[in-house]
A protein has these predicted regions:
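Catalytic cores and adjacent flexible loops of soluble metabolic enzymes
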Residues: 1-333
Length: 333
């Protein structure tokens, strides 16, 4: 990744299994200025058992009587759909990403030529999964929701031992609750990850709004991932906790502004304020008329604007010197 923040617009399963909706999501992400749009790749039978229950937030936004398997089955994207979406992303000049949730999906995304793999928080303790992705030697973005430092370390070690270069791993601090309560965000943990592992870090956000994403960038995040939708009122598990198009665009603008605002870290006057030095700073001036030969003292000199004369930091040096010319009141010394 470059110094520019890599913004991932997370479409996830907000396409509701509809390729037309998926393409509209790509349009929105590209128009907003995101760097990538991310989907999810899975086969329901490989991901959950038929008796698996849905999360509480999923029960609130989907049919309460259907199982997690039934919900997810409707959201699968087949191989041809993946190919069509990848081609559409190229047309829109935005990177296609997808999170694989099972072995077959890892193979599919590798065959489709993805150079970056996103590992979700739920797979951070899945040893066979980590070994399979690690063996591909791709760039990896690893979400760390629900994990402690020991689990993150074990996942990194597995990826590296399997063939991934350490420097090709980026870590995303995350909280997997949709939406995440503000008191549970713990953005400082992102810095802990950076200090502990020396890797590029970012934030995968599930809070409502955009302020936490902008704060994360100000704290050093190099990757931001955020769910978005065409309409929060659409049926499906994640729409309600996602940004709508105008909110996504506002987040991207905010992040790009913070990128500029962070600067180079050197303390100096900026180009835009250079002309203000003469206007806002002060110089040593004549407090009253001064004749040639008089001695400068606190009685006949003072400090006033403008700032293009003798710097007042030289006050002690000037006091006691002999005036070499005549000065009128307010003349620069």
């Amino acid at each position: 990744m470059s110094n520019r923040v890599f913004i991932i617009a997370e479409a996830g399963v907000n396409h509701n299994g509809d390729i037309i909706l998926a393409k509209k999501l790509i349009d929105v992400a590209a128009k907003a200025g995101a760097d990538a749009v991310k989907f999810q790749t899975f086969k329901a039978q490989n991901l959950v058992s038929k008796n698996a229950q849905k999360a509480s937030y999923q029960k609130e936004t989907t049919d309460k009587n259907e199982s997690q398997f039934e919900m997810i089955k409707k959201l699968e994207l087949d191989e041809n759909t993946h190919k069509e979406l990848i081609a559409y992303c190229k047309q829109k000049n935005i990177t296609f990403l997808s999170t694989p949730f099972d072995s077959d999906s890892i193979k599919l995304l590798d065959e489709l030529g993805l150079s970056t793999f996103k590992i979700p928080s739920g797979e951070i303790t899945n040893l066979p999964y980590l070994r399979q992705i690690g063996g591909l030697n791709k760039k990896i973005i690893l979400s760390t929701g629900m994990a402690n430092l020991g689990e993150v370390e074990a996942a990194i070690e597995t990826l590296v031992k399997s063939g991934t270069k350490h420097e090709n791993i980026s870590l995303l601090h995350a909280n997997t609750q949709y939406p995440t309560p503000m008191e549970d965000v713990n953005l400082k943990a992102m810095i802990t990850l950076k200090n502990a592992f020396g890797l590029e870090v970012g934030y995968s956000d599930h809070t409502l709004g955009i302020e936490v994403d902008i704060a994360a960038v100000a704290m050093g995040a190099k990757i931001i991932e955020k769910h978005f939708t065409l309409d929060k009122s659409l049926p499906g598990p994640d729409h309600k906790a996602s940004l709508e198009p105008d909110e996504l665009a506002a987040m991207v603008r905010g992040i790009r502004n913070i990128e500029l605002a962070l600067g180079d870290g050197l303390k100096h006057f900026s180009k835009s304020e250079s002309e203000n030095i003469k206007i806002a700073r002060k110089s040593i001036v004549a407090k009253c008329d001064i004749k040639k030969g008089e001695i400068f003292s606190e009685q006949n000199i003072c400090v006033k604007r403008p700032g293009d004369g003798i710097n007042p930091m030289r006050w002690d040096e000037i006091i006691g010197q002999i005036s070499q010319k005549e000065y009128k009141q307010d003349d620069l010394i």
